[in-house]
Amino acid sequence: KKVFCSRSLFELLGIQETDEDYTYLELEGFAKMMQVLGNGIRESEDVSLYQISREHSIQYLRLKIVKAENGYQTGVLLDVTEEVEKQQRLERERDYDQLTDLYNRGAFRRSTEALLGSGKLSCAALIMWDLDNLKYVNDTYGHEMGDRYIRLFADQLKRLSSLGAVVERHSGDEFMAFLCGDSEEQIREEIRQFFCSVRDVSLKVDEDYELPLRASAGVTWYPRQARDFASLTRYADFAMYMAKHSTK
């Protein structure tokens, strides 16, 4: 059996095979050539999306297989890089906070609820932070410095992401994280280490003064204290409020 291949197929695959408008390949040779696509993402029964790493870019190709009544199959390979990148930009704008590059509220809730509904969690903590001194920074040094203060804390939170936590900017000066683990003891230690690292961070607001980075936090535990997202958030919010006002 032989496979009819157009010249554009070779061009899409980055293979210089022929100068003719089309050629025929043995089935075995065709299958070997198509291995350059790797493992694709099945979008439907007959359509798959492939990602190929080029020297300076990523290319996305969509392969659609059409089955004819006579038993023959026709494959159409399209370059859909522009379409996929546009969709990725839209999804990023939908899911991420522009100032901090953390999840926004909607994306955080979807991700956390997916984990809660997975049936795979043994223990987790939902932590809510409220930045201390942000109003002071804004009023004294301006909102640009306030944005730097916010980003500084967001950069610390990204360390929790490396531990598998889901993190977000909840509102102007509030942040949340959902941290999973094998036990409360393990998660407590990770939270403690995070707080210790934050206490060593400060924002240089002028030549003579650095403002320590500070935030009040509340923690609630899954499954011991709550099992659904709304309850976990409500309890963490209350715990954060109590922590913030008990230190005033």
Residue ranges: model-predicted function:
Residues 60-98, 106-116, 166:
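Signal-transducing coiled-coil linker helices
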Residues 11, 91-95, 102-125, 132-162, ...:
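Conserved long alpha-helical elements within nucleotide-processing catalytic cores of c-di-GMP signaling
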Residues 64-68, 201, 220:
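Output-coupling edge of small sensory domains
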Residues 169-170, 187, 198-215, 244:
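Catalytic core regions of nucleotide second-messenger enzymes
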Residues 167, 193, 216-224, 231-247:
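Cyclic nucleotide signaling catalytic output domains
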Residues 13, 20-53, 116-117:
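Terminal output helix/cap of sensory domains in signal transduction proteins
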Residues 41-61, 71, 209-211:
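Per-ARNT-Sim (PAS) sensory domains and their PAS-associated C-terminal
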